């Protein structure tokens, strides 16, 4: 213990001696470093083309005709103004030594290019002004390491597009001015990704026709969209801008604002829709804007009819002190010039809204998506009453149930607890209309198909009990399986008890038999149709073949008939006695009873149809007929011997 105490005392003694020495050494080194830095920096001088003030912390070089950034700018400069010169390019490391610079003004020059690394070293830069130059692209690479940049001005540059992640290197931005980009043609969906600290955005006079995606700007408070071309403002245009307080959409040719278009702007305080083409607004359009106190609707051609009455009432209640803010009636003629707040219901005869497409009862299985439609006039408002008494509108926030823009009630997935009656409530200035539908959610067990059928399953069981001879029916409801969008039913199981000795039979009737029977009937009908078709086809083919053969035979007969001449001569049975001698001398040599000798053939004018042609010579045959020299013989006629009572015919060919 004594040794330990001596070591401890010795250690404290050395600490007491060394600590003052270390402290004095550090002070000397700091003093030497300061002297060396002052010596290396030399005297602070202001560039000859600039004017300096506040001990060189403010340097102004405007309107000096500079074509580049001047050299020799003091290193302790906090404010540097180079506006209205002819600077065309900013090279890398131009401002590297200006570590304390907070404001850099380069507007109204001719800058066309900014190199990557042009703003290196500006760790303290707060504001960068590049408006009124000739930039065609956003110099995203030059914004690297500007960790404290709060304001960026790029207005009035011929920038053609804003790509994705154009400003993700400067997440500290709070004000971004992109106004008057008259050459702008495209804004990417992810153009403003990473700007979660942005408070002010100017996109006015950029020739924008569709609202860009502003969802990443969760902290945006002021939005300038005036001077563009928006024919209509749709729901979701300002999605995600729950912190927005001021919205300007002036002189943008807006002619239609759909209902629920401003539902997401819960923090909006000021809204300016002046100098547009609005003639009416949907019922209760401003109801979700609970903090709205300043509204500008003047210089619009308002049509003062039943659809404008709700706006007149709303203005009188929420903005009673400023009747000139919201314009005058443009139509009808007897209302022209009257302030909107002066319009009352006595001037019109209005009717309650009608529901064009009412919701229908729906049976659906658990876990599926569902919709209950309720299509209504565009200038009315739609709300839904749930079975538990909750009222939902488009602006409501529910984890699974939402009201779509067209009034449809949408379920991302249904639960058994969603079963009940849902009522669609449509309202306008004259009244309201309601339509209800029943949603039945069943369990998703045995869900093997998208649709279920109307089925009744009967289960018959038996008990062996002599005393129980009566049948008992006990209906047991079970849930329907499957999913059917509009028409389905629950399955009913009937348990039937009968007395059958020592037998257990469980017959079940399912829709499979019915489906099989229907399928057999369809197949039978199909076979009959096919058989009829085949029979008709074969009959037509047979008729075609017969017709072809008859036609061919007819053609052959016509050819043969045209090539021959048939001459029939009738010979009487009784021959005169005077001719018997001649018959004996006939060259045929036919004799005996029943022989007939043909008479001598002489030339007859009626039978001889051959005429001698010019220069032709004729000969005579054995019959004495004149023939052409080429014909020297002629077949002798046939002698046909028949019964005495028959007639003899001679055929000469």
Curated annotation (Swiss-Prot):
The keyword Disulfide bond applies. This is Leucine-rich repeat-containing protein 4. LRR repeats lie at residues 76-97, 100-121, 124-145, 148-169, 172-194, 197-218, 219-240, 243-264, 267-288. It comes from Homo sapiens (Human). Keywords: Cell membrane, Disulfide bond, Glycoprotein, Immunoglobulin domain, Leucine-rich repeat, Membrane, Postsynaptic cell membrane, Repeat, Signal, Synapse, Transmembrane, Transmembrane helix. Glycans are attached at residues 277, 322, 363, 388, 410, 434, 440, 447, 450. Residues 39-75 form the LRRNT domain. Residues 549-653 are cytoplasmic. N-glycosylated. The lineage of its organism: Eukaryota, Metazoa, Chordata, Craniata, Vertebrata. Residues 300-352 form the LRRCT domain. InterPro entries: Cys-rich_flank_reg_C (IPR000483), Ig-like_dom (IPR007110), Ig-like_dom_sf (IPR036179), Ig-like_fold (IPR013783), Ig_I-set (IPR013098), Ig_sub (IPR003599), Ig_sub2 (IPR003598), Leu-rich_rpt (IPR001611). Residues 1-38 form the signal peptide. One of its GO terms (biological process) is synaptic membrane adhesion. Residues 39-527 are extracellular. Specifically expressed in brain. It is a single-pass type I membrane protein. Interacts with DLG4. Interacts (via LRR repeats) with NTNG2. Forms a complex with DLG4 and with NMDA receptors. Its main location: membrane. Synaptic adhesion protein. Regulates the formation of exitatory synapses through the recruitment of pre-and-postsynaptic proteins. Organize the lamina/pathway-specific differentiation of dendrites. Plays an important role for auditory synaptic responses. Involved in the suppression of glioma. GO terms for cellular component: dendritic spine; excitatory synapse; glutamatergic synapse; plasma membrane; postsynaptic density membrane; Schaffer collateral - CA1 synapse. The last 4 C-terminal residues bind to the first 2 PDZ domains of DLG4. Disulfide bonds join 46-52, 50-61, 304-329, 306-350, 374-424. SMART domains: IG, IGc2, LRR_TYP, LRRCT, LRRNT.
